[in-house]
Design a protein with these regions (language model features):
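Non-catalytic, solvent-exposed segments at the cell envelope interface
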Residues: 1-381
C-alpha cells in the first residue's frame, strides 16, 4: 500500500505521485540519473529507502578520508557538479577503463540540470598519482582510471582509479571540486532495465550491433581477431521498447560501419538519451505503483552503484534534487575531432569553444552561454 493522503485537487488531473512520500519521489530522479547512467524508484515504504541506502556501495572516491579530510554534514546547495563514470569490467584482475564519463551540473536553483560527456578517447595530461606509483603522462582520458586503480600485489581498485580520473577531469574542465561521484557497472544497466520491465526510447537512426546476434547471444570472433562473424542485432529508427540486453548493447555501439557516423560522439549522445529515457520510465505509473517491481529495481540499482557524496548519502542528494525532472535535464554535446600524429590516430581533442563552456559552468553563466551557442544542445535529447 502507498503511504500518504488520498484525494485530488479539483480540476487537476490526479498525479501518479499523489500519496507517495516526498523522499520516495525525489530519490527516483537522482537514483535514475546515477544509473547512466541509472535507475531507481523508491515508493511507499520506509523499508525500501533503508534497503536502497544499505544496498548502494560506498567508497572513498575522492581520497578525502585517506587525506584526513573531515566530512561535514550541511545542507546540499547548488551549484553542484557530480561526476558519473560507467565501467564495463570483464575480469577482476584487469584494471578498469572508464567507458563513459559524464558530468551533471546543477545550477544554484536546484531545479534543472546540464548533462555532458567527455570523450573517453580525449587526449589529456594525466597528473602523477603516487598512490598507484604513476608518474603522470599524456594518454586517453579513460586510461586515467586504469592507471589510478593499480595496487601492488592485489586486484585493481576502481575507487582509487576514480580518484585519479576525477583529478584529471578537474584539470581538463577547471572544475575545482566535485560534490559527489558515482561508479556505475554497465552490466547493471541490463538488470535495472529488466527490473523496470524494459525502457522506451527513440532510436535516431538504424544501428547494427557489433557484438550481438538478433537473439542477444554473442557473435563469433573472426579467426585471428579483427571483428565478428554472423548476423547482427538491429535497432531500427523510431520508437522502440528495449529489453536490458538491447539497451546496453545499443548504447555501446560506436562504429560508422554499423550506423553511428559520428563514432564515440554518437555513442555519448545515445547514452545521454538513454539516461533521460530511464528517468521517464522510472516515473511511469507502471513502475511507481508497483511495490514488487520497485523492490526489484532497488536491488538491481544498489548492486550496480558505488557512490560518494562527500558526507551525504545518495538519498540526501535525491532529496536535494527533488525538483529535477527528465524534461529539465539539458543534454550537451561538446564539439571536437581526432588527433593524429604522423598519420596515426592518437585520440580526440575538444574545440577551443569548449573551454568557454567549462568557464560558463564554473562561473554560473551557463544560461547565457547556451543562448549564444544553441548548437551545444544535443539533438534528439
Amino acid at each position: 500500500m502507498l503511504v500518504g493522503k488520498a484525494g485530488t485537487d479539483r480540476g487537476r488531473k490526479p498525479s501518479i505521485w499523489r500519496g507517495v512520500p516526498r523522499w520516495a519521489r525525489v530519490c527516483t530522479i537522482f537514483g535514475v540519473v546515477l544509473m547512466v547512467l541509472s535507475g531507481s524508484v523508491l515508493v511507499g515504504y520506509q523499508a525500501l529507502m533503508s534497503r536502497y541506502e544499505g544496498a548502494v556501495g560506498k567508497a572513498d572516491l575522492f581520497g578525502d578520508r585517506a587525506a584526513g579530510a573531515s566530512e561535514k554534514k550541511s545542507d546540499i546547495k547548488g551549484p553542484l557538479n557530480i561526476l558519473l563514470v560507467g565501467i564495463d569490467p570483464r575480469k577482476p584482475e584487469t584494471p578498469p577503463l572508464a567507458d563513459s564519463i559524464m558530468i551533471l551540473h546543477v545550477p544554484a536553483g536546484m531545479d534543472r540540470g546540464y548533462l555532458f560527456s567527455l570523450p573517453r578517447d580525449l587526449r589529456v595530461d594525466i597528473p602523477a598519482f603516487p598512490k598507484a606509483n604513476f608518474r603522470g603522462g599524456t594518454d586517453k582520458l579513460n586510461a586515467a582510471m586504469s592507471y589510478g586503480s593499480r595496487v601492488a600485489g592485489q586486484n585493481p581498485d576502481a575507487a582509487r582509479g576514480f580518484e585519479l580520473l576525477a583529478k584529471t577531469v578537474q584539470q581538463v574542465t577547471g572544475i575545482k571540486r566535485f560534490d559527489a561521484g558515482a561508479i556505475i557497472n554497465f552490466t547493471g544497466f541490463k538488470n535495472i532495465v529488466d527490473a523496470m520491465g524494459g525502457v522506451d526510447m527513440y532510436i535516431e537512426r538504424d544501428v547494427k550491433s557489433e557484438h550481438r546476434k538478433p537473439d542477444g547471444t554473442m557473435r563469433q570472433l573472426k579467426p585471428g581477431g579483427g571483428g565478428y562473424l554472423g548476423p547482427q542485432a538491429e535497432y531500427k529508427k523510431g520508437d522502440a521498447h528495449l529489453s536490458g540486453w538491447q539497451a546496453l548493447d545499443y548504447v555501446r555501439q560506436r562504429y560508422p560501419k554499423n550506423g553511428v557516423p559520428d563514432a564515440d560522439y554518437g555513442r555519448q549522445r545515445h547514452q545521454q538519451q538513454f539516461v533521460k529515457a530511464m528517468v521517464n520510465q522510472a516515473f511511469s505509473a507502471d513502475v511507481v505503483t508497483n511495490p514488487i517491481k520497485l523492490d526489484r529495481v532497488l536491488r538491481a540499482a544498489g548492486q550496480s552503484l558505488i557512490f560518494n557524496g562527500r558526507g551525504h548519502s545518495v538519498v540526501d542528494f535525491a532529496l536535494a534534487l527533488k525538483d529535477i525532472r527528465a524534461n529539465s535535464i539539458e543534454t550537451i554535446k561538446l564539439p571536437g575531432g581526432p588527433v593524429t600524429i604522423d598519420g596515426a590516430y592518437k585520440g580526440e581533442k575538444l574545440q577551443a569553444v569548449a573551454e568557454d563552456f567549462f568557464a560558463a559552468i564554473r562561473t554560473e553563466q551557463i544560461d547565457a552561454f547556451m543562448l549564444e551557442h544553441p548548437d551545444f544542445k544535443q539533438e534528439n535529447s
